[in-house]
Amino acid sequence: VSRPTGNTPFPKRARTLNPKQYGHEVTTPETPMPVRAWIVTMSGDEFEIDAEAIAWTRRAVHISYMDRFGHPDTAWVWAGAVVRR
């Protein structure tokens, strides 16, 4: 188990899954879908946020959201962490 050290680059960015985790058959909708999603930041904080699903696979969802500082960001998260709004 890793522990925050205070030296993590971009500690408030969401952790994102890698392609081996989310799979290869990616579906991309014409219009992003409004969702609520749980993210875990690089420093280990957990937040439930409003986001848009911009792509998905059987296992995961690629979300686009505004971080708590008002900056746009994206992350791949597990499908179980996402519900439609």
Feature-to-residue mapping (PLM):
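Basic/aromatic-rich interaction segments and small domains that mediate binding to polyanionic partners
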Residues: P4-K12, T16-A79
